[in-house]
Amino acid sequence: MMFRQSMLTLSLFAAFYANAESSDTVFQPASYTPSQMDFGGVGLIKMPTGRMAPEGEFNLSANINHEYRMYNASIALFPWFEATIRYAIVPNKRMGAQEFSGDSPYLDKGIDFKFRLLEESRWLPEVAVGVRDFGGTGLFDGEFIAASKKLYTNDYGVFDFTLGMGWGYMGMHGNVTNPFCKANDKFCERPKDFGGTGGEVDYHRWFKGPAAIYGGVEYQTPYQPLRLKVEYDTNDYSEDFPTRFRPGDFYEVDMTQHTPINVGLIYRAHRNIDLRLSYERGDTVSAGFSLRTNYNELASQWRDEPTPRPSNEQPENINEVDWQSLEKQLALVAGYEGVKIHVDDTTVIISGEQVKYRDSEIAHERAAAVLRNQLPKSINTYKVINTQQHIATEAADIDAKEYERVANVSYIKPHISDASSVSKDTKVRGQQVHDGSERLYYGVSPTLRQSIAEPEEFYIFNLGVRGEASYWLTNQLQASSSIQVNIYDNYPELNFIVPPDGTTVPPRVRSLGRMYFHDNPVRMDTLQLTWFDNFGDSIYQQTYAGYLESMFAGVGTEWLYRPRGKNWAIGADINLVAQRDPDSWFGVYQQETQYSAADGRSFKVLDKGYTGFVSGYYMPKWSWLDDTLFKIDVGQYLAQDVGVRGDFSKQFKSGVIVGAYASLSNLSSEEFGEGSFTKGFYISIPFDVMTVKPSRNRAKFDWQPLTRDGGQKLNKEHDLFSLTDSASPWFTRKNTVPQP
């Protein structure tokens, strides 16, 4: 019997570590790195610059003044591309009707993009173009083109000058004729309308209407922690949302711009922490901070078992091998668990699940070191097979004689690749001499279910404990189950059970979360049978039936074609599902129309329906899109709407993955509700950059701006693309950041 304590507590802030700067370095010759602005992203105070943050830099920032509280997350995905997600709270405005959102202040969500057009050279500035409040509600929407140029001095620090042109929110001064207006009259006026119910891309407004020239300078003083900023702000604030008084507002706000000159300072309190203070519009003080790290700089620092040194005490023949000891050493030293061992003439084959090392070469070298010491010299080949859910996904053949030369450093710079080769043959042959696999697995882990920026509460969460167990009935058939126990949540802050969001067309496949996650403090999340299979070395399949997730039961199958070593794969799944009754562990809804007595209204659920997709995966090898993954799903969602989901992710040197997805379907914006379509973002962080032990596990933070019912997928327990990752690694790519 095997017990593992699962480690699933999510932590983004574990990455924010560094040594504090010592006092003897702060007066070294000044060096300049771009800093964040109030809106998030690289900029001056309110106005963006042509600068980009270093590739891989992630910033969490906040800025507070009388009119706004802004919370931002920015990421430099590429040297030429930066994205920012922003929450803006407007304290003087009520979110909505009091019976719906109580006294919660107005909350706006926005996304910004910036693209570098020209990299700075000796004579030319760095030039960037960007869009603010992309797909938002239009509170801050605007566009800009900016150029920045640095001036270094020997004794007085670094000056970074910026000159730009803004439209929309950044062009309210209208101090220059819109150059696009001269080319086409449609650019002379900026449309007042915004698409749908928010969330749509209002590209028909871009670069239209009044334009304004802005500028400023950021000054890195000789005292390294201190930098100063001054800018000419071209928003006159006459149309800012807090100034638009309406019945129900908490109080009135005057945002008259007494001067367009804003000044500010930044103090670097720590290598990864900036404190900001600014004086804006001639009468407003703003304060903020930013926390940052760089995902291209997070090295793995382990305390690991030492690799065994070559020993002369090898057994004389195969009959003298202690297979039990060999299994334990393969798990402890090389990370292969549940090992089965076969002997085929002069080849020893081990197959097991790799749980420690993302770098397969480290796993192979450590396995070879163990096998070399515990097998007789008559063995010529070590075959190492990595399995996931008993599916073979990767194999390597290690020449025992060549490895002997590597282990004894018989030549300059020996490497495990000198003795090993990737094998397409993952079949097990010969006589089985040991079976270390465990049929029963069980574990307990903490869980955190959270939602940020809902209309009735900024942060809604559910903290609990999840117990899970699985049992292999055969080598291919697994029974599994999980039970969730709530410890604490703040769902009672919700003022409804069925959200009064105005939607009636799609069934409530995801927006009934409170009924499942709060009203049932102890619940069965999953109970299912799963059959795993593979055909040849490229085709994988799973079939499953039961209670598939917390909200749906059903039966389904998934197929995946994934050639080993290739940068693409094709898959498909089809599922017949029914929505589970939240008031019963084993029941499902029998009728489409239901009634909520607490809310006094009817609503629709999915009593029976199909969902499934054809999926394509592609990892391009283009230099300007290196280390990225595109995934496209085409099919039918849970709400029976039909459409396509696109998912794009970028992996940094440390293995941290940042991605975004969007689901488009045949639901109109009005049928979908606020947000217009489902969209989300996620960060996946390898445990081995946050802990001192090697691990292939990951912590994932997934965020959807709004949870609506359209464009939602089934949350299957197993995903074949993840299970077969070793066939062409994505999630288990090695950390390439040099050790400190």
Regions found by a protein language model. Name each.
Residues 21-139, 151-155, 221-226, 231, ...:
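Transmembrane beta-barrel domains of Gram-negative outer membranes and organellar outer membranes
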Residues 88-112, 116, 130-142, 150, ...:
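Outer-membrane beta-barrel translocator/channel fold
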Residues 1-20, 648:
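Gram-negative bacterial Sec-dependent N-terminal signal peptides
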Residues 61-63, 74, 84-88, 128-132, ...:
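Transmembrane beta-strands of outer-membrane beta-barrel proteins
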Residues 22-23, 184, 193, 197-201, ...:
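Flexible, glycine-rich linker and terminal segments associated
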Residues 58-59, 79-85, 92, 120-127, ...:
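Repeated loop/turn-to-beta-strand initiation elements of outer-membrane beta-barrel proteins
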Residues 60, 71-75, 85, 111-115, ...:
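Residues on the lipid-exposed face of transmembrane beta-strands in outer-membrane beta-barrel proteins
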